[in-house]
């Protein structure tokens, strides 16, 4: 890889810190993820003149559907039923987890960009009350109750589902800390994408 980098203008993926010094012509770095993972950004990359892009918007509906799959599965106790099925047990009673009527449930979406907006619309389609926290508020999302980042702990304490669709960046590191998780209700569900 290092031998190819001096003549490379664009990379799809990631350039490690030890390879970046060889990327003399690098002008474009395309991340394959909407929100790059921890370690993607490092000091030398941030200081480099390369333009870093991501496929923002491409996966909005797919990821929102994936999130709703978890919301539905967890609200109905599906993991407990699957565990009983795996052990060939017929459980007539409700599972040990709390049943959540989504039409009476609430969710907090942290990061209301494209994925968060799509998730909000799907939650609302099930009758859920949806709260959102975002720093930029780029999207109009009808029916969403807006909050600022300083309200994270308080709103997280009130909802049934806390859904994080915020990208993992240096600015969001530590956003979900012990205080937030301690404030959440014991029966609340946290999902991080």
Language model features: what each stretch is:
Residues 136-193:
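Rossmann-like adenosine-cofactor binding region
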Residues 4-5, 20-23, 102, 153-157, ...:
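A short, aliphatic-rich alpha-helical micro-motif
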Residues 116-117:
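N-terminal Rossmann-fold NAD(P) dinucleotide-binding loop
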Residues 112-113:
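Glycine-rich Rossmann-fold phosphate-binding loop(s) that bind the pyrophosphate
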Residues 48-106:
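Phosphate-binding beta-alpha-beta segment of Rossmann-like dinucleotide-binding domains, i.e.
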Residues 1-52:
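An N-terminal-biased, well-structured beta-alpha scaffold segment characteristic
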Residues 131:
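Conserved beta-strand positions in the Rossmann-like core of class I SAM-dependent methyltransferases
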């Amino acid at each position: 890889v290092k031998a190819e980098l001096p003549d490379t203008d664009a990379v799809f993926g990631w350039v490690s810190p030890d390879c970046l010094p060889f990327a003399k012509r690098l002008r474009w770095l395309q991340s394959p993820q909407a929100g790059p993972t921890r370690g993607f950004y490092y000091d030398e990359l941030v200081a480099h003149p390369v333009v870093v892009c991501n496929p923002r918007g491409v996966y909005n509906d797919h990821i929102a559907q994936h999130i709703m799959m978890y919301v539905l599965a967890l609200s109905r106790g599906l993991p407990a039923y699957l565990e009983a099925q795996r052990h060939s047990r017929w459980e007539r009673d409700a599972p040990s987890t709390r049943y959540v009527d989504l039409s009476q449930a609430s969710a907090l979406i942290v990061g209301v960009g494209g994925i968060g907006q799509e998730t909000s619309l799907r939650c609302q389609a099930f009758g859920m009350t949806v709260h959102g926290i975002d720093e930029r508020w780029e999207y109009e999302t009808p029916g969403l109750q807006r909050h600022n980042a300083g309200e994270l702990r308080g709103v997280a304490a009130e909802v049934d589902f806390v859904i994080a669709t915020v990208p993992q960046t240096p600015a969001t590191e530590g956003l979900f800390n012990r205080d937030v998780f301690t404030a959440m209700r014991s029966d609340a569900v946290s999902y991080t994408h």
